[in-house]
């Protein structure tokens, strides 16, 4: 028993698959930019909201009470400086960097010899990672579906003319 498989227009199909990389360049760049903004938004949200359970301090200039975050929690917002210094920078078309320009950012993120970490950027990345991966998957799926529709249309077109 023999089974023959004949792929018509293989060169055209392979050409379309070869375009997949080119077709995905702009959507991937959109995901990179949007992913950076998503990470920044998560970091800001973690600092500005959520119950903090650290020590309450009396602060001066201006006079106020401030509840600090406990070790392991995102830092508690006090003056808004930390949040205002979180930036998204486009390094090149495929790389976005989320960074905090506050002088004390690294001390909060990683801790010091006298203070345990109050991370805010890495947890924001971890929380955003699934959404970013899903956005990449959706764009790949859309591009592949577009090629699949083209291949089906090509097959239908070939059947139409082979019947004549």
Where are these regions (language model features)?
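Short, Lys/Arg-rich flexible segments
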Residues: 1-164
């Amino acid at each position: 028993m023999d089974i023959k498989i004949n792929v018509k227009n293989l060169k055209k199909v392979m050409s379309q698959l070869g375009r997949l990389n080119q077709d995905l360049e702009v959507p991937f760049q959109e995901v990179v930019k949007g992913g950076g903004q998503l990470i920044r938004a998560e970091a800001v949200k973690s600092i500005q909201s959520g119950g903090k359970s650290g020590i309450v301090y009396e602060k001066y200039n201006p006079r106020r009470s401030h509840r600090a975050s406990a070790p392991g929690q995102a830092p508690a917002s006090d003056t808004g400086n930390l949040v205002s210094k979180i930036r998204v920078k486009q390094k090149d078309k495929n790389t976005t960097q989320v960074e905090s320009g506050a002088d004390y950012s690294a001390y909060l993120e990683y801790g010091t010899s006298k203070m345990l970490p109050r991370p805010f950027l890495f947890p924001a990345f971890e929380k955003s990672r699934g959404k970013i991966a899903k956005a990449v998957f959706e764009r790949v799926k859309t591009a592949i579906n577009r090629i699949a529709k083209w291949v089906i249309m090509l097959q239908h077109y070939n059947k139409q003319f082979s019947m004549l």
